């Protein structure tokens, strides 16, 4: 393995492997978040009091625009090709940054480590969201900031700021590259590597670059007639309401996901790399204090952003990848190589397990199967609401939803007493179908009242996978959905 990684084609092979392995996601149905983004994008109709119109989602407009474009060109799974390209580019960019801060050998090993992290099913090999798409921009911003300081050049600083700003259009919490640039510039000034005028020139260029994607989003909102307060709420204000909703619920599931995420960080090697770097931070500081300060700031920002996410889903681990790769390149040769081997073995074993599980037909797609069954039973003009929000089921059914929340968290935060849901059920726009994917009383004390109101106007009409109750509005004649819930 060590001799193979020493070859001059290592970076290219690692990038190709990352691309091809990520393309395996094309064989799997669209996931809940991806489906939700596509549905929001399809119905996108901005207004003064709504960024997206019919549906609410707390994600930036550039991300939804990307999903809208991909869906228009090649359907909901098109974004997975974009994700595969992003992962391949990450490998190349990570190698370039490692070459910049270390040497050619570090570049090759870091490239392999990057490929392992973006292709391990322990994090997520299939779905593509903002975290994955942002990775090459974040790492490239780090490299360009280093070039700007080394050459005292404004153009790399401008490019670094631009690339650091783009991830905020993919997920609004991805500010780690901004922190890295700020700390690096200030620390370089304090260390005497930059004069005051040079600091001002580089900082000004970086801020100008950062402003381009931010102002572009603001400009779009103004042109579309969306109030800036609504844009701010969708991106940041909603998080306070979401945190309150999460705090009111049971912490058991969150704690379990947090423990699983912590285990994933260890098994994939991410946590070990970060701990190994921080354990030797004094040595790194003596060799290059400005770089060390910037890397520590990068890692700290990533950890905080991941923690503030609140739900601790396993793909949160992607947020730590940029800091992990930079830290990996700076580790001592022997330690770096051992850790990369650990990453490769971990990714390889999980790929084998994931492949066997899928090829043998053991992988469940219950949301997909239920959605397909509903599509077969429904007639044109039917509508559907999935209680608890399963956008992957919704999109496979082919049915529109008259309820604005396609995810459970917006429902819990913005309709906590289920007032909107109950008004919908009792009103003229009541959906033809309701799938009780979660029991009605899961998150709200009004769940029993909602179930009683639904029972007055709907009848139980079969079950989805895992025994989920399907309700059909009274007076409507449709065949009973019969999902093939294999395995």
Task: Describe the residue ranges of each PLM region.
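Membrane-lumen/periplasm interface segments of specific transmembrane helices
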Residues: 201-244
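Hydrophobic/aromatic-rich transmembrane helices and adjacent perimembrane loops
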Residues: 176, 303-337
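Membrane-interface helix-loop-helix junctions at transmembrane boundaries of multi-pass membrane enzymes
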Residues: 5, 99-100, 105-106, 153, ...
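Signature aromatic-anchored transmembrane alpha helix within multi-pass, membrane-resident enzymes
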Residues: 12, 207-211, 332-354
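Membrane-interface transmembrane helices that cradle and orient dolichyl/undecaprenyl
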Residues: 139-159, 189-193, 268-285, 332
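Membrane-interface alpha helices of multi-pass inner-membrane proteins
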Residues: 19, 156-172, 177-183, 212, ...
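Short periplasmic/luminal acceptor-recognition loop of GT-C membrane glycosyltransferases, typified by
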Residues: 360-445, 465-466
């Amino acid at each position: 393995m060590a001799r193979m990684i020493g070859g001059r084609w290592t970076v290219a092979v690692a990038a190709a492997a990352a691309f091809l392995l990520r393309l395996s996601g094309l064989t799997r149905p669209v996931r809940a978040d991806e489906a939700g983004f596509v549905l929001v994008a399809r119905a996108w109709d901005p207004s003064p009091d709504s960024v997206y119109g019919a549906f609410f989602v707390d994600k930036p407009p550039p991300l939804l625009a990307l999903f809208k474009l991909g869906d228009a060109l090649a359907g909901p799974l098109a974004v997975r090709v974009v994700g595969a390209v992003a992962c391949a580019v990450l490998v190349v960019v990570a190698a370039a940054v490692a070459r910049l801060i270390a040497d050619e050998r570090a570049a090759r090993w870091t490239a392999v480590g990057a490929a392992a992290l973006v292709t391990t099913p322990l994090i997520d090999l299939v779905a593509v969201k903002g975290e994955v798409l942002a990775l090459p921009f974040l790492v490239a911003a780090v490299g360009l900031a280093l070039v700007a300081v080394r050459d005292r050049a404004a153009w790399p600083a401008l490019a670094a700021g631009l690339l650091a700003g783009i991830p905020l259009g993919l997920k609004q919490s991805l500010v780690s590259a901004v922190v890295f640039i700020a700390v690096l510039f200030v620390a370089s000034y304090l260390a005497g590597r930059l004069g005051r005028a040079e600091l001002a020139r580089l900082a000004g260029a970086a801020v100008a670059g950062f402003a381009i994607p931010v102002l572009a989003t603001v400009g779009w909102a103004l042109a579309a007639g969306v109030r800036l307060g609504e844009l701010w709420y969708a991106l940041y204000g909603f998080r306070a309401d979401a945190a309150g909703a999460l705090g009111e619920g049971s912490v058991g599931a969150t704690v379990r996901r947090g423990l699983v995420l912590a285990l994933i960080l260890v098994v994939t090697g991410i946590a070990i790399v970060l701990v190994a770097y921080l354990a030797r931070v004094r040595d790194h500081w003596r060799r290059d204090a400005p770089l060390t300060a910037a890397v520590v700031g990068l890692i700290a920002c990533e950890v905080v952003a991941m923690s503030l996410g609140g739900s601790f889903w396993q793909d949160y681990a992607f947020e730590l990848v940029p800091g992990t790769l930079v830290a990996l390149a700076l580790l001592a040769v022997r330690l770096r190589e051992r850790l990369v081997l650990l990453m490769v073995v971990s990714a390889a074993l999980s790929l084998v397990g994931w492949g066997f599980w899928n090829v043998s037909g053991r992988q469940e797609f219950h949301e997909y199967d239920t959605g397909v069954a509903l599509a077969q039973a429904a007639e044109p003009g039917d509508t559907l609401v999935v209680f608890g929000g399963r956008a992957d089921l919704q999109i496979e059914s082919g049915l529109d939803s008259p309820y604005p929340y396609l995810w459970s968290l917006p429902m819990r935060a913005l309709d906590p007493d289920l007032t909107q849901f109950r008004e919908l059920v009792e009103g003229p726009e009541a959906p033809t179908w309701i799938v009780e994917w979660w029991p009605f009383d899961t998150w709200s004390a009004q769940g029993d009242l909602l179930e009683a109101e639904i029972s007055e106007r709907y009848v139980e009409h079969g079950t989805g996978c895992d025994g989920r109750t399907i309700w059909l509005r009274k007076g409507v004649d449709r065949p009973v959905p019969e999902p093939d819930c294999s395995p």
